[in-house]
Swiss-Prot record:
It is found in: Bacterial flagellum basal body. Structural component of flagellum, the bacterial motility apparatus. Part of the rod structure of flagellar basal body. This is Flagellar basal body rod protein FlgB. GO terms for cellular component: bacterial-type flagellum; bacterial-type flagellum basal body, rod. The basal body constitutes a major portion of the flagellar organelle and consists of a number of rings mounted on a central rod. In Gram-negative bacteria, at least four rings, L, P, S and M are present, whereas Gram-positive bacteria lack the L and P rings. The rod consists of about 26 subunits of FlgG in the distal portion, and FlgB, FlgC and FlgF build up the proximal portion of the rod with about 6 subunits each. Its main location: other. Signal peptide: none annotated. InterPro entries: FlgB. GO terms for biological process: bacterial-type flagellum-dependent swarming motility. Belongs to the flagella basal body rod proteins family. It comes from the Bacteria. Keywords: Bacterial flagellum.
Length: 124
Protein backbone atom coordinates (compact mmCIF):
# COMPACT_ATOMS: atom_id res chain seq x y z
CA UNK A 1 0.00 0.00 0.00
CA UNK A 2 1.44 3.33 -1.07
CA UNK A 3 0.32 5.97 1.41
CA UNK A 4 1.83 8.76 -0.66
CA UNK A 5 0.33 7.77 -4.02
CA UNK A 6 -2.08 10.71 -4.06
CA UNK A 7 0.57 13.15 -2.87
CA UNK A 8 2.99 11.92 -5.55
CA UNK A 9 0.38 12.47 -8.25
CA UNK A 10 -0.22 16.01 -6.99
CA UNK A 11 3.55 16.52 -6.99
CA UNK A 12 3.62 15.68 -10.71
CA UNK A 13 0.83 18.17 -11.40
CA UNK A 14 2.52 20.85 -9.27
CA UNK A 15 5.81 20.36 -11.13
CA UNK A 16 3.97 20.43 -14.45
CA UNK A 17 2.21 23.72 -13.69
CA UNK A 18 5.52 25.23 -12.54
CA UNK A 19 7.22 24.24 -15.82
CA UNK A 20 4.22 25.46 -17.83
CA UNK A 21 4.38 28.81 -16.04
CA UNK A 22 7.97 29.26 -17.26
CA UNK A 23 6.94 28.42 -20.84
CA UNK A 24 4.06 30.91 -20.73
CA UNK A 25 6.34 33.61 -19.32
CA UNK A 26 8.72 32.89 -22.20
CA UNK A 27 5.89 33.59 -24.63
CA UNK A 28 5.24 36.94 -22.94
CA UNK A 29 8.93 37.81 -23.02
CA UNK A 30 9.01 37.09 -26.77
CA UNK A 31 5.76 38.85 -27.67
CA UNK A 32 7.71 41.39 -29.77
CA UNK A 33 10.27 38.96 -31.22
CA UNK A 34 9.89 38.60 -35.00
CA UNK A 35 9.01 35.06 -36.20
CA UNK A 36 8.54 33.78 -32.63
CA UNK A 37 5.91 31.04 -32.34
CA UNK A 38 3.99 30.60 -29.12
CA UNK A 39 4.69 27.51 -27.06
CA UNK A 40 2.75 25.63 -24.46
CA UNK A 41 3.36 22.65 -22.25
CA UNK A 42 0.68 19.98 -22.29
CA UNK A 43 0.40 16.63 -20.55
CA UNK A 44 -1.02 13.25 -21.38
CA UNK A 45 -2.11 10.48 -19.07
CA UNK A 46 -1.50 7.17 -20.75
CA UNK A 47 -4.04 4.54 -19.70
CA UNK A 48 -2.81 1.10 -18.69
CA UNK A 49 -2.65 -1.60 -21.36
CA UNK A 50 -4.79 -3.92 -19.25
CA UNK A 51 -8.11 -2.38 -18.19
CA UNK A 52 -8.53 -2.23 -14.43
CA UNK A 53 -11.81 -3.11 -12.79
CA UNK A 54 -13.36 -0.42 -10.63
CA UNK A 55 -16.11 -1.01 -8.11
CA UNK A 56 -17.76 2.36 -8.58
CA UNK A 57 -18.36 4.48 -11.69
CA UNK A 58 -16.79 7.53 -9.99
CA UNK A 59 -13.51 5.79 -9.25
CA UNK A 60 -10.52 7.35 -10.97
CA UNK A 61 -8.95 5.08 -13.54
CA UNK A 62 -5.35 4.07 -12.92
CA UNK A 63 -2.90 5.66 -15.34
CA UNK A 64 0.45 4.22 -16.22
CA UNK A 65 2.36 7.21 -17.43
CA UNK A 66 2.25 10.98 -17.04
CA UNK A 67 3.91 12.55 -20.06
CA UNK A 68 4.64 16.22 -20.78
CA UNK A 69 5.10 17.66 -24.25
CA UNK A 70 6.22 21.07 -25.41
CA UNK A 71 4.06 22.18 -28.32
CA UNK A 72 4.97 24.96 -30.74
CA UNK A 73 1.98 26.59 -32.42
CA UNK A 74 2.86 27.49 -35.98
CA UNK A 75 -0.60 28.74 -36.93
CA UNK A 76 -2.84 31.31 -35.38
CA UNK A 77 -3.12 35.05 -35.43
CA UNK A 78 0.09 36.52 -36.80
CA UNK A 79 1.17 40.10 -37.18
CA UNK A 80 3.44 41.61 -39.80
CA UNK A 81 6.42 40.24 -37.87
CA UNK A 82 5.03 36.63 -38.19
CA UNK A 83 4.74 36.39 -34.40
CA UNK A 84 1.64 34.59 -33.12
CA UNK A 85 1.78 35.52 -29.42
CA UNK A 86 -1.30 37.25 -28.01
CA UNK A 87 -0.49 39.02 -24.75
CA UNK A 88 -4.13 38.75 -23.62
CA UNK A 89 -4.20 34.98 -24.25
CA UNK A 90 -0.89 34.44 -22.46
CA UNK A 91 -2.01 36.45 -19.42
CA UNK A 92 -5.26 34.46 -19.35
CA UNK A 93 -3.36 31.16 -19.53
CA UNK A 94 -0.98 32.30 -16.78
CA UNK A 95 -3.92 33.07 -14.47
CA UNK A 96 -5.58 29.69 -15.20
CA UNK A 97 -2.26 27.91 -14.66
CA UNK A 98 -1.70 29.76 -11.37
CA UNK A 99 -5.14 28.69 -10.13
CA UNK A 100 -4.39 25.07 -11.09
CA UNK A 101 -1.04 25.26 -9.27
CA UNK A 102 -2.67 26.60 -6.11
CA UNK A 103 -5.44 23.98 -6.28
CA UNK A 104 -3.00 21.08 -6.64
CA UNK A 105 -0.93 22.51 -3.80
CA UNK A 106 -4.00 22.69 -1.53
CA UNK A 107 -4.98 19.11 -2.38
CA UNK A 108 -1.44 17.89 -1.68
CA UNK A 109 -1.35 19.74 1.65
CA UNK A 110 -4.75 18.30 2.55
CA UNK A 111 -3.52 14.77 1.79
CA UNK A 112 -0.39 15.33 3.87
CA UNK A 113 -2.43 16.75 6.76
CA UNK A 114 -4.72 13.71 6.64
CA UNK A 115 -1.72 11.37 6.71
CA UNK A 116 -0.27 13.36 9.60
CA UNK A 117 -3.51 13.00 11.60
CA UNK A 118 -3.64 9.26 10.87
CA UNK A 119 -0.04 8.79 11.97
CA UNK A 120 -0.65 10.75 15.17
CA UNK A 121 -3.86 8.80 15.78
CA UNK A 122 -6.18 11.80 15.77
CA UNK A 123 -9.41 11.98 13.86
CA UNK A 124 -10.21 15.68 14.03
Amino acid sequence: MDLFRGVNLYKKYINFTWKRHKVLLGNLANADTPNYKRRDLIFFLEPPTIPLKTTHNKHVKNFRKFEERLVVFKNGLQGNDRNNVSIERELSEIVKNKLAYETYLKFAMGSLNTLNRVIKGRAE
